[in-house]
Structures are given as C-alpha cells and as structure tokens.
C-alpha cells in the first residue's frame, strides 16, 4: 500500500486551514463569511435547477397516470355501449 506523504502543496496550504489559539494550539479556522455566502448561493442555485426537474417529473408522472385513467374510462364506456346495445337488440 502506498503511504501518503505531505507534498509541498499540502505543506504550503496546511497553515491556511488552521489558526493558532491563545494557548498556542492549532485549531481549525472558521469559514470566511464570503465562502459561507458562496455555499448558500450554490445551494440556492442547485435548488433552482432541481425544482424544474421535479416539476417535469411530476408532469410526466401525471401524463402517465392520465392515459391510464382515460383508457379505463374508454373501456368502461365501450363495454357499457356494447352492453346497452345488446340489451336493446335482445
């Protein structure tokens, strides 16, 4: 198995994500407000993208359901007409 080594990039960026506390210990930095805003914006954008897809899926589902209901109605009407014709002729 390959052992992970600290590359210069990891070493150079490692200090960005940590900060030294008053006692000298390194703690994770809190996210910057702009990055939090950006994440919120990304989530809103994704929600706006997902919402029309959900609407399309619902419309597709409804269009699938409606032909079934229509075909059932058509079948019932045809049978009723055949039945009533048969009743009238006999």
Swiss-Prot record:
Residues 65-87 are annotated as: Mitochondrial targeting sequence. It comes from the Viruses. Disulfide bonds: none annotated. Its main location: host cell. The record marks 66 as: Low pathogenicity. One of its GO terms (biological process) is symbiont-mediated perturbation of host apoptosis. Keywords: Apoptosis, Host cytoplasm, Host membrane, Host mitochondrion, Host mitochondrion inner membrane, Host nucleus, Host-virus interaction, Inhibition of host innate immune response by virus, Inhibition of host MAVS by virus, Inhibition of host RLR pathway by virus, Membrane, Modulation of host cell apoptosis by virus, Viral immunoevasion. It is found in: Host mitochondrion inner membrane; Host nucleus; Host cytoplasm, Host cytosol. GO terms for cellular component: host cell cytosol; host cell mitochondrial inner membrane; host cell nucleus; membrane. Plays an important role in promoting lung pathology in both primary viral infection and secondary bacterial infection. Promotes alteration of mitochondrial morphology, dissipation of mitochondrial membrane potential, and cell death. Alternatively, inhibits the production of interferon in the infected cell at the level of host mitochondrial antiviral signaling MAVS. Its level of expression differs greatly depending on which cell type is infected, in a manner that is independent of the levels of expression of other viral proteins. Monocytic cells are more affected than epithelial cells. Oligomer. Interacts with human SLC25A6/ANT3 and VDAC1. Interacts with host MAVS. Belongs to the influenza viruses PB1-F2 family. Is not encoded in all strains, and seems to be dispensable for replication. This is Protein PB1-F2. The lineage of its organism: Viruses, Riboviria, Orthornavirae, Negarnaviricota, Polyploviricotina. The gene is PB1.
């Amino acid at each position: 198995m390959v052992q992970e080594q600290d590359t210069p990039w990891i070493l150079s960026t490692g200090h960005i994500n940590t900060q030294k506390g008053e006692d000298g210990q390194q703690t994770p930095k809190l996210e910057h407000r702009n990055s939090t805003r950006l994440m919120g914006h990304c989530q809103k954008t994704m929600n706006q993208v997902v919402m029309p897809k959900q609407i399309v899926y619902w419309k597709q589902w409804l269009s699938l359901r409606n032909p079934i209901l229509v075909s059932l109605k058509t079948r019932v009407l045809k049978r009723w007409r055949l039945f009533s014709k048969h009743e009238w002729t006999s």
